[in-house]
Amino acid sequence: MTTPGTFEIHATDGAARTGCLHTAHGIVRTPIFMPVGTVGSVKAIAPDDLEAIGAEIILGNTYHLYLRPGDELVARRGGLHEFNAWRKPILTDSGGFQVFSLSGLRRIAEEGVEFRSHLDGSKHLFTPEKVVSIQRNLNSDIMMVLDECVPYGADRTYTEKSVGLTTRWAKRCRDAYPKGAAGNLLFGITQGGFFKDLRTRSIGELTDIDFDGFALGGLSVGEPKAEMMDLLYHSAPLLPADKPRYLMGVGTPLDIINGIAAGVDMFDCVLPTRNARNGTLYTSLGKLNIKRREFAEDDGPLDPACSCYTCRTFSRAYLRHLYTAKELLAFRLNSIHNLTYFLDLVRGARAAIAAGRFAEYKRSFEAIYPEEVVA
């Protein structure tokens, strides 16, 4: 078995690249999209569904799993893979983004971040060491360091201090879990807000620490699309070429295409499943709102170009009926389709990169989503 953490690049096309990352629970082919299973399950989707649509890795949330059911309870059940019956790789984020989203319910200090649970108001402290310990209990294949995600609009003075804190926390995470200590991988998270020089500084400081991969954090937090893309194309090439690059929490299909074009390998976002539950579906012709009356007697498939179970089996009319009747099956069928769309997107990207035609592939998505194209 190849050592977990081995990252192989198979082909490049411009900055875009395709390869594979070896983990303790299998190989992840990149570029990859990771369905989000916040509390240990991808909403409305069973592990068998994920297998059927070709998911290779899913994401879990450290903050939520720590609060409920508790990381120690999960550890007693053999870890998250045994607990949720997903046998392929799992990435857990550090919970930092969720904690910092609590705003008035948290306090940041050198030691870590103190916060109150959104469930019952109980007080907790996340230190870098604690976050690593929680993720070790979950036994995820890829663990993330604790970082400070600054909000959009934070000034330079605050952001500069935050970069220093994120670096110190990252070092403490690495010290708490030395490289090669077990089969779990540990990724660093670069920050820097919306200042290019601070992004560059954060990347330099984090890459001096021997992490198994590196993430771009703090993007897609309310900033204009043009600003996000400018920072993405500035930052991604600065990350080590021989390690996997992860763009956290991003995003739309065209965001992912742009991320791949910038040299990013890994993506996650709640968008496909959240939009599925709201009746917004992604197709080869763009977004479709299944609630619209025009689909009430439409016997055609949701997307003729899609081969997922939903599109092979059911009509738009039936899907609209399920949604308007508030049937739970609508959530499952819509989610199967949207996740298939996102996974097909990265599968197509891998093929396009290998064939040397990624620029053409990118243009095809720009034609589908012209409103998202940044000049």
Swiss-Prot record:
* Binding-site list for Zn(2+): C306, C308, C311, H337
- Which co-factors does it depend on? Zn(2+)
SUPFAM superfamilies referenced in this protein's UniProt entry, alphabetically: tRNA-guanine transglycosylase
Q: Which residues bind substrate?
A: D93, S94, G95, G96, F97, D147, Q191, G218
The reactions it catalyses are: 7-aminomethyl-7-carbaguanine + guanosine(34) in tRNA = 7-aminomethyl-7-carbaguanosine(34) in tRNA + guanine
Q: Where is this region: RNA binding?
A: 249-255, 273-277
| InterPro entries named among the record's database cross-references | ArchSynthase1/Queuine_TRR, TGT, TGT-like_sf, tRNA_ribo_trans-like
Q: Name one GO biological process term.
A: queuosine biosynthetic process
The function of this protein is: Catalyzes the base-exchange of a guanine (G) residue with the queuine precursor 7-aminomethyl-7-deazaguanine (PreQ1) at position 34 (anticodon wobble position) in tRNAs with GU(N) anticodons (tRNA-Asp, -Asn, -His and -Tyr). Catalysis occurs through a double-displacement mechanism. The nucleophile active site attacks the C1' of nucleotide 34 to detach the guanine base from the RNA, forming a covalent enzyme-RNA intermediate. The proton acceptor active site deprotonates the incoming PreQ1, allowing a nucleophilic attack on the C1' of the ribose to form the product.
Query: How the protein assembles, per its UniProt entry?
Result: Homodimer. Within each dimer, one monomer is responsible for RNA recognition and catalysis, while the other monomer binds to the replacement base PreQ1.
Instruction: State the similarity comment.
Output: Belongs to the queuine tRNA-ribosyltransferase family.
Q: What is this protein called?
A: Queuine tRNA-ribosyltransferase
Provenance organism: Nitratidesulfovibrio vulgaris (strain DP4)
